[in-house]
């Protein structure tokens, strides 16, 4: 049986590190901090971690707690332009870069970043 992406990169520990590093940047980012209520950063962090773990072959906790991901629907209330997308991607690239190459080799790193780029582009819902 082929190993899942989730298991290949270290499972929950790796996703927790990526998401934690991402959310550590949010309060300091002038664009992103407007999108995330300060009183729910921990909740947002948990939801993103659970989503990514499930997407990449880990536990299905996200769906069991929140239902189908429906990313576009869940992000529709937020005005997301290329500016917000690029800020999100900048912080996510920094978070992914913080994971050592032994844990996240080049092939898996590229696959993860390609997905994150695609997802971020698909969530843009406003031209300006």
Swiss-Prot record:
Cofactor(s) essential for the protein: heme
Domain of life: Bacteria
SUPFAM superfamilies: Globin-like
Record InterPro entries: GlbO/GLB3-like (IPR044203), Globin-like_sf (IPR009050), Globin/Proto (IPR012292), Globin_bac-like_CS (IPR019795), Hemoglobin_trunc (IPR001486)
Annotated positions binding heme: 75
Disulphide-bonded residues: none
Cross-link (Isodityrosine (Tyr-Tyr)): 23-36
Pfam families named among the record's database cross-references: Bac_globin
Single GO MF annotation: oxygen carrier activity
Free-text cofactor note: Binds 1 heme group per subunit.
Positions of post-translational 3',4'-dihydroxyphenylalanine modification: 36
Keywords: Heme, Hydroxylation, Iron, Metal-binding, Oxygen transport, Transport
Post-translational modification: Contains L-DOPA (3',4'-dihydroxyphenylalanine).
Similarity comment: family membership: Belongs to the truncated hemoglobin family. Group II subfamily.
SUBUNIT field: Homododecamer.
Protein known as: Group 2 truncated hemoglobin GlbO
Organism: Mycobacterium leprae (strain TN)
Gene name per UniProt: glbO
């Amino acid at each position: 049986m082929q190993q899942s992406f989730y298991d290949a990169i270290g499972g929950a520990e790796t996703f927790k590190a990526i998401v934690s590093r991402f959310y550590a940047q949010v309060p300091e980012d002038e664009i992103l901090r407007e999108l995330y209520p300060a009183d729910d950063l921990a909740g947002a962090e948990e939801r993103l971690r659970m989503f990514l773990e499930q997407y990449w072959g880990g536990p299905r906790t996200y769906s069991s707690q929140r239902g189908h991901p429906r990313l576009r629907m869940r992000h529709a209330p937020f005005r997301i332009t290329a500016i917000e997308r690029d800020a999100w991607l900048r912080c996510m690239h920094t978070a992914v870069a913080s994971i050592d190459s032994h844990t996240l080799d080049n092939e898996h790193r590229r696959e993860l970043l390609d997905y994150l780029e695609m997802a971020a582009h698909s969530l843009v819902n406003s031209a300006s």
